Amino acid sequence: MWEVLALRYARHDRTAQSNFMMPVPDPHDAMPMDYFVWLLRGPEGRLVLVDTGFSEETAAKRGRTILRPVGDCLRAIGVDPAAIQDVVVTHLHYDHAGNLDLFPNARFHIQDNEVSFATGRHMCSHCLRHPFEVQDVVRLIRAVYADRVVFHDGEGEVAPGVTLHGVGGHSGGLQMVRIATARGPLVIAGDASHYYANMARENPFPIVFDLGAMVQGWRRARALAGGDESLVIPGHDPLVRIRFPAEPGNPEATRLDLPPYS
């Protein structure tokens, strides 16, 4: 079985309407966004990282607040980034695929169609390329040429108990991660649902490439979790840190494999 830690590295203050496509009752209410990477600790000390966050340079460019750089988040729980051998990139948006150079010994797991999307004709449109940072995409392509990228076509496996599931929607090749844990099959939905409320209300986050695929992705996440929505983890919701216990001695690290408080 695997342990799963959500590591918060940044945040952004914003209003509720910024996080939904359709109108909400109180659009001006505060609804901040947290930014996470996820560390999976498996049998015999195996480590898998899900997503790589963004750099301080990108934070300044996009008006985000870094609380602790991703490398420092990992070191705070005793993990040397150079020791990580497998990194899952759920998609290539700036907040999920920066800092690739922090992981010189890792293989990067990504969907075929996400790389095609991020390097193809859709990037000729500003509205579609806005969530990407070109230097992040270039680093991924350099990793391809260095034989350090593992491509997946829909379903895939990173390690026993860690599987990948392509759903698209938010980005052309978004993938979710399913992890075998002591409390059941945990699903890192990531940006298939930024907040619990996106999925619960069926009101999508407004950055979306394929709306139909996003809606089907919510259903897929529930199914992968065996119908237990407490096992579906959204990509950016501050409620994650309220619902689950912190790693002892590190309040920015949250243990998702342990039972939620409620």
Which role does the model predict for each range below?
Residues 3-6, 37-42, 48, 153-182:
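Core dinuclear metal-dependent hydrolase active-site scaffold
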Residues 4, 40, 51, 84, ...:
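Divalent metal-coordination and catalytic microenvironments
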Residues 9-10, 52-54, 92, 113-114, ...:
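Active-site metal-binding loops of divalent metal-dependent hydrolases
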Residues 64, 68, 72, 176-262:
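Cap/insert and terminal regions of metallo-dependent hydrolase folds
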